């Protein structure tokens, strides 16, 4: 890998979250949860946001913990791609 290619890929943001929906074709919805400190009260609050991410092979299922990486816009709402599976969902 060239030096320019290493720099270009490292600039992309990566997030780790849980797949909450896999009903769309080649798209999963990933929930990202962050703990932030409230500016006035100091209590830690859980903030969350959902991202649509590209899943080319439809291989990620609901409950999987995945890493997503920012990419060029693929559609109106999809600018992320699933880069790897962190942890598979537990089957009960």
Swiss-Prot record:
GO cellular component, one term: cytosolic small ribosomal subunit
InterPro entries tied to this protein: NA-bd_OB-fold, Ribosomal_uS17, Ribosomal_uS17_bact/chlr, Ribosomal_uS17_CS
Keyword line: Ribonucleoprotein, Ribosomal protein, RNA-binding, rRNA-binding
Cross-referenced CDD domains: Ribosomal_uS17
Name of one Pfam family that matches: Ribosomal_S17
GO biological process, one term: translation
A molecular-function term among this protein's GO annotations: structural constituent of ribosome
Gene3D superfamilies assigned to the protein according to its UniProt record, in alphabetical order: Nucleic acid-binding proteins
Membership in a protein family: Belongs to the universal ribosomal protein uS17 family.
Function of the molecule: One of the primary rRNA binding proteins, it binds specifically to the 5'-end of 16S ribosomal RNA.
Subunit structure: Part of the 30S ribosomal subunit.
NCBIfam families in the cross-refs: PRK05610.1 (NF004123), uS17_bact (TIGR03635)
Protein name in the entry: Small ribosomal subunit protein uS17
Gene label: rpsQ
